[in-house]
Amino acid sequence: MKVTLAVLLVLVSSGALAAPDEEALGKSRGYPVCANAQGSFSPEWCLVGVMSHYDSVYPSRVVKKPGTPRPLRRAAPEPALGLDRFLAEHRNTGLLVMRGDTILAERYQYERKAEHRFASMSMAKTVVAMLVGIALGEKKIASIDDPAAKYVPDLRGHPYGETPIRHLLTMTSGVKFEEVYNGHDDVMKLGRAILFQEGPGGAAAVLPYRERVAPPGQRWSYASSETFVLALVVRGATGESLSDYTTRMLWQPMGAESDAAWNIDPAGNEVGYCCFSATLRDWARLGLLLADGGARDGRPVIPADWVKAATSPQAPYPGYGYQTWVSMKQDRFHLRGLRGQAVWVHPATRTVVVHTGVYRIGGNTAAVAQDNFFDVILRAVGN
C-alpha cells in the first residue's frame, strides 16, 4: 500500500531534534581538525572536522567543476520524509534525498554546510570502477580480461599484476589482504604508507602483499588494495592522473556544481580506494547519473552496458558487482564507505539518497539503518 507523504509525517517525523553525541564529537571545541589526524581512526572529538576536510588534511589534487553545473530543482514545500527523526538517531553529517533532478530534502548536522566536501571512504571504489568503464569504452583499456600489469608494468611478476582486471573489479584476486578495521590490519598499513605519506607510493605500496590464497575469480574477499591497483591501471591506460581523467571524463560531463578532490600518495598517485571528497549535491548528481544508466539528459557519460554490469551481481558473493554493492532485492544498489558514507540508488524511480556520517566502526548497524530508511523513502515517494 502506498504511504502518502502526509501520513508519513505523522508516523515518523517529529520536528527538528538534536544531533546525537554532539559533545563527544567535538561541539564545544568547534568540531576541529586535530593534529596528526589518523583518517577515519581519528579521535571522536575531531572526526567531524577530519571527515569534512580530507582534501586539506592530506595531500590532494583538485577535480575541477565545469563552467555550468547540471541544474537541480528543489521541492517547494519540502515534503515530509522523516529526516529529522532519522538524524536524531544517527550520526549523519549530511543527508540528501533526491528524485530525478529534484532535491526533496537536504539536511546537515554538526555545523556542516552544503559547501563542505565530505570524504568518500570506500564510495570512491565505485568512482574508480566507473572510470575503468569509461576507459574501456574509449578502448584505452582493451579488455577487462587483461592482466593489470599490461597497464602497470611495475607489477609484472607480482600476483596483483597477474590478476585480470575483471577479478580486481569484483574483489576476487585471491591475494591475501586483511581488512577488518582494527587499526592494525593490512588496510591500515596501506593507508599509513600512501595516505599518511609514511611509505612508498604507486605500485611499490602493494608489493608486500604477495601471497595468493585462491585462484582469481574463485573467492570474494573485500580488499582496498585491489581498488588501488585499479586506479593505477586507469592512470597507466590513459596516461593521465586519475584526477585529470575524472575531471575530463566524469565530473565535468556529469555537471558537478563544485570542485572535488582526490587524495594522493607520496608518488602523486590517487588513493583510489578511499579518498575522494565531494559535496552532498554532487554525490547526488553522481547517483542520478548512475540511475540513468550513465547518461545525462540522454547523452552517455559512462557506457550504459558498463553501468548495468557494474551494478549487477558479478562476484561469488551475490551482493557485489564491480566495486559497487548490490541489494539482495536487486532493484537498487549503493556506494558504501566506512563510518556511514553511502549513496543509495533506485533506478526505477530515479531516487537517490546520500548519507555522510561519523558512525561508529563495527557491525552492520549503519547499512541496516540506511537500507530501512531507504525503504521508507521509496514508499513515501510512491515506489
Where are the language model's segments positioned?
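Bacterial N-terminal signal peptides
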Residues: A6-S14
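N-terminal leader/targeting segments and the immediately adjacent pre-domain N-terminus
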Residues: A16-K113, I141, T170, G174, ...
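Active-site SXXK
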Residues: D101, A119-I144, L168, L230-V234, ...
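Short, charged, amphipathic alpha-helices and their helix-cap/turn boundaries
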Residues: T102-R107, A149-K150, H184-P216, E240-D259
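A short acidic/small-residue loop/turn micro-motif
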Residues: Q109-K113, R117, Y359-I361
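Active-site helix/loop module of the DD-peptidase/beta-lactamase fold
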Residues: A119, E138-E178, Y209, G236-C274, ...
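Active-site-proximal alpha-helical segments within enzyme catalytic domains
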Residues: E226-V233, G272-A295, Q341-G357
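Active-site Gly/Thr loop motif
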Residues: E257-A260, W306-V352
